[in-house]
């Protein structure tokens, strides 16, 4: 991080076009000449290893099996933990995507197969927030049975077509069978299951959503005590994320996380870096991160911010302002009051004339690619309540239904607050595991609210396997029909939940397959029962994403005919010891 003195002049900031950015150094009308160099550069690729046909597929399968075996251990309420040897103390986790991301295999070709399963887990985690282990196990099973068929002479392209068509039909069936979430009981059940049957976490997530709604729950924080608590703080969430992923400060979660950040709010478009150089200098001298909320940040300004962020000169992020037109200005006023109630936001004020005293302050800022959460200082509570009262008065007086709805949205964002889940534990290892479980529970709950719920415990996938024969009848090509059979075999791999609980998986699958939709096996209590009534439920979105992503990656593997990887470099021999020195 640059020191305050290092940014005393604008010329220190690196421009995306020049070595130095000099504020106002280029005279108006002055032309910058560029001279093409005559040098020619040749790039030499590393030596490669190439494998074809069965050899390539066997290497992929070996890597896929190793990673899927490790991830599959965690499946179900009685799944096992996995110890990850990382920097510092080992981490004990039960989270599929965390395990997948930590595994790198020594064999380059096998690692290529493992990377495909990592992609399944990561993509499912990004889209649904949970179900990564299920997606990994499904992908492995589809690939395993698919490669056997390819080796036996089946057309891989036709197999892929059959898999894709079958999965699409199953998703349509899933949408018909899912039901919406009904109150806090369902929310608690979903959160409890996703947290590894931890009822305390389930109750906490349900309590947080009950207090502020699903939009008000913020990312998880570490607590200074041993207890895990939910605290509702003044704040709001806006439906705009960072303009560029280069601003990310937490690469693992793809988030920007700031504390005690200064906030520049404007309804103008920022294109020239010289307009904000004074603000950048001041915030850097204060060692405070800067959040810029503007109509847009483009061109030279964006490029220069990104370059200096990557070089560690600036701690900054840019976000587009929410809304459009007059509504955008009103929402920016709301944000201004939340972050700095003592300073009125002057929309006519030019960005270059903004002083450090006119910037807002946010105690905590969390920004994803889709949303921004601001937690305000407690001192803004009185002004915030006054703003809410004003908006309620405007809503009461307006005759427009549209305006009334938009005012209601703004009131909800300002009054709902932000529920901060502060996680406590006795050790760092337990803290990390607990935070991962709460993150899964929170994401699964949002997914359930979005697309509804289905029976859990793997029962939904087993029940879906029974409709595949009817789907297969609509296919004419033999290899396309074989693709449907592959999906059917993969769906019953959820028997792994029973196996992890010490029960014969095939027997469990056989019983579930010929029972009603709601009935399934509860591995926690070792009983067959109505899973919806017992609270063993999964979000339909998680099941859908796991199935789609597994089929997508499996299709790519089945149509792969060769692998090209870097050839390992031979290890240099150890230097000989000097004469007379014993090693």
Curated annotation (Swiss-Prot):
This is RuBisCO large subunit-binding protein subunit alpha, chloroplastic. Oligomer of probably six alpha and six beta subunits. GO terms for molecular function: ATP binding; ATP-dependent protein folding chaperone. Belongs to the chaperonin (HSP60) family. GO terms for biological process: protein refolding. Residues 15-31 have a biased composition (Low complexity). Residues 1-45 form a transit peptide. This protein shows ATPase activity. This protein binds RuBisCO small and large subunits and is implicated in the assembly of the enzyme oligomer. It is found in: Plastid, Chloroplast. It comes from Brassica napus. Residues 1-35 are annotated as: Disordered. Keywords: ATP-binding, Chaperone, Chloroplast, Nucleotide-binding, Phosphoprotein, Plastid, Transit peptide. One of its GO terms (cellular component) is chloroplast. It holds the Pfam family Cpn60_TCP1. The modification Phosphoserine is found at residue 89. The keyword Chloroplast applies. The keyword Transferase does not apply. It comes from the Eukaryota. Its main location: plastid. Residues 1-14 have a biased composition (Polar residues).
């Amino acid at each position: 991080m640059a020191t305050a003195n290092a940014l005393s002049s604008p010329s220190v900031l690196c421009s995306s076009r020049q070595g130095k950015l000099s504020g106002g150094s280029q005279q108006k009308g002055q032309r910058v000449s560029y001279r093409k160099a005559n040098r020619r550069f040749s790039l030499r690729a590393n030596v490669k290893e190439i494998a074809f046909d069965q050899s390539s597929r066997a290497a992929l399968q070996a890597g896929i099996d190793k990673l899927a075996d490790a991830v599959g251990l965690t499946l179900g309420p009685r799944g096992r933990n996995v110890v990850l040897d990382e920097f510092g103390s080992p981490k004990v986790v039960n989270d599929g995507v965390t395990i997948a991301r930590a595994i790198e295999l020594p064999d380059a070709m096998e690692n290529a197969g493992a990377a495909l399963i990592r992609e399944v887990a990561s993509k499912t985690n990004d889209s649904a927030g949970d179900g990564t282990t299920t997606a990994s196990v499904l992908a492995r099973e589809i690939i395993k049975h698919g490669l056997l068929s390819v080796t036996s002479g089946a057309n891989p392209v036709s197999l892929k077509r059959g898999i894709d068509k079958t999965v699409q039909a199953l998703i349509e069936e899933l949408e018909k069978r899912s039901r919406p979430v009904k109150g806090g009981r369902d929310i608690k059940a979903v959160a409890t299951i996703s947290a590894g049957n931890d009822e305390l976490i389930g109750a906490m997530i349900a309590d947080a959503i009950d207090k502020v709604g699903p939009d008000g729950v913020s990312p998880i924080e570490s607590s200074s005590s041993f207890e895990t608590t939910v605290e509702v703080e003044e704040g709001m969430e806006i439906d705009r994320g960072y303009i560029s992923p280069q601003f990310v400060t937490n690469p693992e979660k793809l988030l920007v996380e700031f504390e005690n950040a200064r906030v520049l709010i404007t309804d103008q478009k920022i294109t020239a870096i010289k307009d904000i150089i004074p603000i950048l200098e001041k915030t850097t001298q204060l060692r405070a991160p800067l959040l810029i909320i503007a109509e847009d940040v483009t061109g030279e300004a964006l490029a220069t911010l990104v370059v200096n962020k990557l070089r560690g000169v600036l701690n900054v992020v840019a976000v587009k302002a929410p809304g459009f037109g007059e509504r955008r200005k009103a929402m920016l006023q709301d944000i201004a009051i939340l972050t700095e109630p003592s300073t009125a936001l002057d929309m006519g004020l030019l960005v270059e004339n903004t002083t450090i005293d006119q910037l807002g302050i946010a105690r905590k800022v969390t920004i994803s690619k889709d949303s921004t959460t601001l937690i305000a200082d407690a001192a803004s509570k009185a002004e915030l309540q006054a703003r809410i009262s004003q908006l309620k008065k405007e809503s009461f007086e307006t005759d427009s239904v549209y305006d009334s709805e938009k005012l209601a949205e703004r009131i909800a964002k300002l009054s709902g607050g932000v529920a901060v889940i502060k996680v406590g534990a006795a050790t760092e290892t337990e803290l990390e595991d607990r935070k991962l479980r709460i993150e899964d529970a929170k994401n699964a709950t949002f997914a359930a609210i979005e697309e509804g719920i289905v029976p859990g415990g793997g029962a939904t996938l087993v029940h879906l396997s029974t409709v595949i024969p009817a789907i297969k009848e609509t296919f004419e090509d033999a290899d396309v029909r074989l693709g449907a059979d592959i999906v059917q075999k993969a769906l019953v791999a959820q028997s792994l939940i029973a196996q992890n609980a010490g029960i014969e998986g095939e027997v469990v699958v056989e019983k579930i397959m010929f029972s009603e939709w709601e009935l399934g096996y509860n591995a926690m209590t070792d009983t067959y029962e109505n899973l919806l009534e017992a609270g063993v439920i999964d979000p339909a979105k998680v099941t859908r994403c796991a199935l789609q992503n597994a089929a997508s990656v499996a299709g790519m593997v089945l149509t792969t005919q060769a692998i090209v990887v870097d050839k390992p470099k031979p290890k240099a021999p150890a230097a000989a010891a000097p004469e007379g020195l014993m090693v």
